[in-house]
């Protein structure tokens, strides 16, 4: 059985999320999974609707989220990450389908974000493992 993944990728910090997306695709192929569809959204906070659309599809086994939440002058990064992570988890439970978190942050500098692009690989691996085990 080939596992079909949907990717939801944030355009904000696209220099980072593009690298993450490429790593995620490469790792999916390595694991024998296929990325069936990728939806680009403006930012991490905008992911839930795209995740829901992919979760509703019969031909998608799991959804991988890819983004990067970098610290700013305010606590905005904390709020974005907290609410996004909660909604991502809620959607996974609502649709009984793995939705994995490939989003490093919050409280992270741009330099730290560059060092964490491998979170995309981890999210792909988690999605594939969950589909196989559940």
Swiss-Prot record:
(2S)-2-hydroxy-3-oxobutyl phosphate binds at residues 73-74, 116. The keyword Iron does not apply. GO terms for molecular function: 6,7-dimethyl-8-ribityllumazine synthase activity. InterPro entries: LS, LS/RS, LS/RS_sf. GO terms for cellular component: riboflavin synthase complex. The lineage of its organism: Archaea, Methanobacteriati, Methanobacteriota, Stenosarchaea group, Methanomicrobia. This is 6,7-dimethyl-8-ribityllumazine synthase. Pathway: Cofactor biosynthesis; riboflavin biosynthesis; riboflavin from 2-hydroxy-3-oxobutyl phosphate and 5-amino-6-(D-ribitylamino)uracil: step 1/2. The active site is at residue 76. Gene3D superfamilies: Lumazine/riboflavin synthase (3.40.50.960). It comes from the Archaea. Keywords: Riboflavin biosynthesis, Transferase. Pfam families: DMRL_synthase. Its EC number is 2.5.1.78. GO terms for biological process: riboflavin biosynthetic process. NCBIfam families: lumazine-synth (TIGR00114). 5-amino-6-(D-ribitylamino)uracil binds at residues 12, 44-46, 68-70, 101. Belongs to the DMRL synthase family. HAMAP family: Lumazine_synth.
